[in-house]
Amino acid sequence: MEQNFTTHCDHEFSWDPNRPLVVACSGGLDSVVLTHLMHQYHGHLILAHMNYGLRGVESDQDEAFVAALGADLGYEVVIDRVAPDSVKNQPGMSLQMKARELRYAFFEHVMLSHHAQGVLTAHHADDNLETFLINLSRSTGLKGLTGIKSSTRGVFRPLLPFKRAEILAFAQNKGYTWREDASNQSDDYQRNIIRHHISPGFDKLERPWNQSLRQTQEYLDQAQTLLQDYLDLVSAQVITETEDGLRLDLTALSAHPSPNVLLAGLCREYGLKAGQDVGQLAQAQSGARLYTQTHELLKDRGVILINA
């Protein structure tokens, strides 16, 4: 795995050997393996760990483990502790979403304050498969199926080609130790249900699914780019500004192929959520309304008025 990791990083990333990289390290299997691999590959790291305090003593033990790992390898460890109440019970936001928001804000702070060239997370092929299946169940459209990217805005994911089983076997062979989060064993979250009961079936396929998935997602990503380019052209033809907002001309839109698909794509720019059927609004009587996350859409004869 070490050689494959090196080959992948050489091909995919262009990191400056003289500038540090921040490794997001929870203390779990994936981030511990990432830390050790990057220790051999780059050797100029800062470990960043966030303690949410959600698991009491176990959270503190995770923190202590990461601090010890950093000390053993000779790296600075930056730790942030947040009150559990700042993560739980946030209106309109799940615990996982809030934790992610806090975590990435912290990682960005560490990156900027240490003049690092990026943040590394331990997302791997199984995470990508789980995300694909979750988005498939949510009808997110092409964009949601294109998967986790190898890098986005200073966040790098060098373990993405590797399956969890490969990572585990490598860690066991090396004799690494890591922390286990008991909450990962429950079926309380959709991702865990997929991880425990659906993803294992993919490992029984004859062809390695991670390669097939990446190829499929590359095709979907290209299709999404083509669709977005076409949406931009259509938008310029059918959407005009008014004093109160925007005016979408349904008659002009109907001259294009698959107008309902285009309509949904155009309205996602204005807060349309998966599952909201803007096509029904287009067929409704004047005066019908649809409220997105950010806008009001009002049917007025042959147009839809879009107001913030």
What do the PLM-derived regions correspond to, one by one?
Residues 14-16, 76, 117, 177, ...:
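Short coil/loop linkers at secondary-structure junctions
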Residues 2-30, 46, 50, 82-84, ...:
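AMP-forming adenylation/ATP pyrophosphatase catalytic core
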Residues 52-56, 184-189, 253:
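Short histidine/acidic/glycine/proline-rich micro-motifs that form metal-
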Residues 37-41, 113, 201-204, 266-269:
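Active-site catalytic microenvironments for nucleophilic, acid-base chemistry
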